[in-house]
Amino acid sequence: MSMPKKLIEVALPLEAINAEAAREKSIRHGHPSTLHLWWARRPLAAARAVIWSSLVDDPSAHPELYPTEEAQNAERQRLFGILEKLVKWENSNDPEVLAAAKAEILRSTNNNPPALLDPFAGGGAIPLEAQRLGLEAHAHDLNPVAVMINKAMIEIPPRFAGQVPVNPDSRTRLDGAAGWQGAQGLAADVQYYGEWMKREAFRRIGHLYPKVKVPHELGGGEATVIAWIWARTVKCPNPACGCEMPLASTFVLSKKKGKEAWIKPITEGNNVHFEVQYGKCPKEYESFKVGRSAVFKCPCCGEITTDAYVKQHGKAHEMGSQLMAVVGEGKHGRIYLSPDVEQTIAADVPAPESYPSGAMPENPRWFSPPAFGMTDYSDLFTNRQLTALTTFSSLVAEAQAKAEADAVATGVVNDHIALSAGGSGARAYGEAVGVYLAFGIDKLTNYSCSLCTWLNQPKNEIVGNAFGRQALPMVWDYAEANPFSNGGGTLMQQLEYICKFLSICVPDCSSISKVQQFDAQSDCGLRNIMVSSDPPYYDNIGYADLSDFFYVWMRQSLKDTYPKLFRTMLVPKAEELVATPYRFDGSTEKARDFFENGMLHTCQQIYQYAREDIPVTIYYAYKQSDTDEDSKTASTGWETMLSAIIRAGFAITGTWPMRTERAGRMISNGTNALASSIVL
């Protein structure tokens, strides 16, 4: 017996959906991408459209109401109009638009919409949009970082919907709960206790971040430092030279017209120091990098290093760093200054007594630093960065306790039930504030490690983040951001993004949502539900390996709040569905078999869960060059996905091409990035 068709099985306003999905990638304020980094997120517009059109009947399902093709087309156009409004970012929480969309879902499901499960929840777009449309959302993932992202998106905010801020500043300005919708009160408290953390951290370690003296010709006085620009160094391979050779890939600081600046290496015998020069950088000083990887020219003698030589010295822990320039907050923009003794001494601090650590995988595809002796995640941070991050992390528990005490003072029930146990009283609220503060620190690590570059863009000179690509590359000249400045890469900037997400993007709803750590290959017990998911793409992204960078810091801050979730030292990897040969002694065949078997078991579980009258939707991202150029066959990942779906008992009833990435973003420029998705 054939089932009545849903809209997604017949027609979609694809151009409108793709236009909104593509536009969304450039939206920053309030978007989930600003809550916490996750790789290859699906656009909210696409997820919203797919869920809604999978639930709403196509007019052809009701010939008694729409007996002619003309009548069906007219009704279809009416539904398209609802969907075209629904996918717009500006309408994400528009009550009229959402009410119209939800009414159609109820009409097509006899007022009994199904729960939705995403077994590979990842960045949380699909569960969030299910919640927005009034569904009971279930988000499962094996990765604790992904689990926390989903908790922060769909589980925690509804629990404290409409909560008035509890902090003392807000209490003096408020009269009742009027005006605080959704998670806006929670956002206000995250901002307040984040400011307290910043002040307290500066009281403890602010002396490590002195202001820089500004010469008279640049305005005089002192300036807050935005960033320190460093170069890694090794001893020159020429025995007659032996200088500490800077491994700088660029000496350009600013390309802004009329404000160009660069770093000039000054050699005196076998010593090198640096002076900042204003004006356009001469071509011969743009870079001393002369080949791929670690091939550099010595400024003293002209000797060229080999990649093997630098790796050898790195593994022997004989690689150093030298300060090349200081970036300050000027009265009219950035000012660039030569390093001085005070700034160099301030950075020379011992490592803190304890800090998060964990071994990086020996997988050069995604991790370059281990080849140069940086084998632990802690090796990716300077001692000053470790000191700042551990200080911030230690303050999360203190801020959490203050928020709990203030919540009790405002009358929030003091039931002592933990957030992880489903609590919604004062203790749970304090812990909820702590979760978002911990997210701010996690985001800060992406801008406060020695893999961050100085982006000398013509329009904006800023500290770049470590994950410009879906990998951790080796960086030779790096920017150390001042976490207490007013520039980018600060804790307060990260918390500002988080608070905007809570205020803008979180739906104002009370839909039940459940997030748990779960292996997609196991039976979770759900039945007669809707399933929509964005599974891993064979070997494209090593989620578990990459997320360890964040996990070690998140665990430091939240292991007492979610002890079960953070019981392991690193992210679980044995069951992760990624075809990674290095986990199988380099065997591509074993990696392929592992992925194929795992994906088949997953699809078999999904088949058990799915409600017969609602199509299962699966995203498969691809690049147009995603073919084997030698055999001219489709990629192994695509074949594996189709095989698993069909062998599990499904029939593919339709496919839709959806734009899900910006083609010009950094990771797609010359790399095997995922440009579009096919929705099955």
Which residue stretches match the model-derived regions?
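Nucleic-acid modification enzymes, centered on SAM-dependent nucleic-acid methyltransferases
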Residues: 2-117, 127, 131-528, 536, ...
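Conserved glycine-centered beta->alpha loop in an early N-terminal alpha/beta scaffold
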Residues: 120
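Conserved SAM/SAH-binding loop
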Residues: 123
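Short, glycine-rich nucleotide/cofactor-binding loops
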Residues: 590-596
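A short glycine-rich, Lys/Arg-flanked "PGG" loop and its adjoining helix->strand segment in the class I
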Residues: 596-614, 643, 647
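Short beta-strand segments at enzyme active-site cores
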Residues: 614-620
